[in-house]
Amino acid sequence: MGKFTSFLKRAGNATKRALTSDSAKKMYKLAGKTLQRVVESEVGSAAIDGVMQGAIQSIIQGENLGDSIKQAVILNVAGTLESAPDPLSPGEQLLYNKVSEIEKMEKEDRVIETHNAKIEEKFGKDLLAIRKIVKGEVDAEKLEGNEIKYVEKALSGLLEIGKDQSERITKLYRALQTEEDLRTRDETRMINEYREKFDALKEAIEIEQQATHDEAIQEMLDLSAEVIETASEEVPIFGAGAANVIATTRAIQGGLKLKEIVDKLTGIDLSHLKVADIHPHIIEKAMLRDTVTDKDLAMAIKSKVDVIDEMNVETQHVIDAVLPIVKQEYEKHDNKYHVRIPGALKIHSEHTPKIHIYTTPWDSDSVFMCRAIAPHHQQRSFFIGFDLEIEYVHFEDTSVEGHILHGGAITVEGRGFRQAYTEFMNAAWGMPTTPELHKRKLQRSMGTHPIYMGSMDYAISYEQLVSNAMRLVYDSELQMHCLRGPLKFQRRTLMNALLYGVKIA
């Protein structure tokens, strides 16, 4: 358990001349053209916000517009295609989640329809039957009395698909670590196929880094979406195909509705079982100007294997420790679904393995806190708080609350969220640089519980999340990159740095 505090480092202040200069007017005009093209490109709000942020940074800090847009686009689009919304805007989070859900469902349905026969051959008919039940394509009578059987099939299916993905990517990882002369023909073929995808991704990112005018941004965004779709499956399940029907592990799991049927019949939320399509460490390697060696690429791929294995251990934990409790609840109701069962097994939303966001009742724009909770089997969490008014950050490992999904007793180590929040507020209040008005608002906030603003999923391992948080505490160059522009953009950039990490190019 650890506790760390630090002052954030911010770049220089704005100059009034920049706002009225001829160069600023040109930037406004160019930003307008750029935004029009980006809006028409169907890439989404992440790209729009990225261009907006780039233009604002240029005007405020006197930077070259191309450089600013370059940084913002790499962070928001090339890095993830799932840029985080403003942590203190529940409405923005809701809209973002709804749009993401619609896009995800459309892609999943397309994958299942295209690869239906191959999925049945590889994973069996039972998983496709679960999809039909959730979508209401079979009679409800077929489910009645067989609920536990379908829950078991869904969980074992999740584990089977996850292990299959882990085995495929681990083979690639081991092949990359093997000396070139000692590789088998299959290993050489596997590496060559992945190298083609990686090189295409690298070229797309190089175009983004060179984008200094609006046409390049349009072309680059379209290319990124296409390349990321192809590169997201390092070793294909069923072989390569057209970009719009590539069968990714994530799309197959989602399309089969395995998590949905578990949630529907038991109340157990498994939405945290997520793996990034392309791990941020692979994106980081693709941003390097130099040739990426096999050993470096292997270590980046190992990061994705770590996330997949963490999700598989979590699924196994649910099967071993939680499923027996589910069966006990069903036995109370003659082994049939009852409306009380989900309520008995549900846990508080603030205890789920996500990043939970809070703010203070007063001076809310400047102060926000994140509580990151690890997968249930790890029983860990941490607190990180930011006071942007005085440029202060506080990190602390915290204990977790006991609940039914831990499957038994928990070990309480360290202080809880409330104690960490109180210390963060006290420390910020006691800083000599804290303005008097801000002090008064902090003092008022100390006597109340922080306001809960929602949660965000993370698609990296918990250890990688902790590492990203520690970089925000200690890396002054990263802090200067994050603390630019209006507070809204600073908060979004900090969340992106926490969720995915940032490569300063």
UniProtKB/Swiss-Prot annotation:
GO annotation (BP), single: symbiont entry into host cell via permeabilization of host membrane
Subcellular location: Virion
Residue span of region Involved in membrane permeabilization: 1-42
Pfam family name, one: Orbi_VP5
InterPro entries per the UniProt record, alphabetical: Capsid_VP5_Orbivir
Primary subcellular site in the record, as a coarse category: virion
GO cellular component labels: viral outer capsid
Gene Ontology MF terms: structural molecule activity
Keywords of this entry: Capsid protein, Outer capsid protein, Viral penetration into host cytoplasm, Viral penetration via permeabilization of host membrane, Virion, Virus entry into host cell
Entry's family note: Belongs to the orbivirus VP5 family.
Function noted in UniProt: VP5 protein is one of the two proteins (with VP2) which constitute the virus particle outer capsid. Acts as a membrane permeabilization protein that mediates release of viral particles from endosomal compartments into the cytoplasm. Permeabilization activity is probably negatively regulated by VP2 and is triggered by endosomal degradation of VP2 and exposure to low pH.
Designated name of the protein: Outer capsid protein VP5
Organism: African horse sickness virus (AHSV)
Higher taxonomy: Viruses, Riboviria, Orthornavirae, Duplornaviricota, Resentoviricetes
